[in-house]
């Protein structure tokens, strides 16, 4: 699977680096590419692991998170920095962090850490491009993480995850059957 992730990263780099546009547009484009790549990678992991339950859980978590996001978008109808509507919460941040949390909780930090890094870039790109305010992407981030956390269970086998509390930091080792 690591070869698959490497190929995706190389493809994304070539797509982003080969386009002759301003840096501002590249950041937005990179975020737009990654917002598709992250859920594709999450779904791809479930297929690579032959994990039908994981496929179902990823679908449920994505539908839950995006359902909450769209309900809030229509209920709040906040104006975007560029004058558009439905700014809060960011759908890009929601699905990116939903995918990252799914990969982290289901398959462990070795998949979750890179996914969280890319999801953070997606959120940054939305603010940098003038599509959202920081509070919009923070709202989307929270919804995405909570939506996946509530639905996703660790994959059978060993799972290593970082853990932090009020007065400690450590590593949690889980075994699922």
Could you tell me what each predicted segment is?
Residues 37-46:
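Hydrophobic core of alpha-helical transmembrane segments in multi-pass integral membrane proteins
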Residues 45-64:
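Interfacial segments of alpha-helical transmembrane regions
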């Amino acid at each position: 699977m690591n070869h698959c992730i490497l190929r995706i990263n190389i493809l994304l780099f070539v797509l982003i680096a080969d386009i002759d546009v301003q840096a501002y547009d590249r950041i937005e484009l990179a975020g737009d590419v990654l917002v598709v790549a992250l859920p594709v990678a999450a779904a791809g992991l479930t297929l690579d692991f032959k994990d039908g339950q994981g496929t179902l859980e990823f679908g449920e978590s994505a539908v839950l998170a995006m359902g909450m996001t769209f309900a809030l978008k229509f209920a709040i109808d906040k104006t975007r920095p560029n004058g558009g509507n439905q700014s809060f919460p960011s759908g890009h941040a929601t699905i990116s962090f939903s995918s990252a949390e799914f990969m982290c909780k289901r398959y462990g930090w070795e998949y979750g850490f890179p996914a969280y890094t890319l999801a953070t870039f997606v959120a940054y790109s939305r603010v940098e491009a003038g599509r959202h305010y920081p509070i919009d992407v923070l709202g989307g981030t929270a919804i995405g993480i909570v939506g996946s956390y509530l639905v996703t269970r660790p994959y059978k086998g060993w799972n290593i995850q970082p853990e932090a509390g009020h007065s400690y930091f450590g590593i949690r080792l889980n075994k699922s059957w």
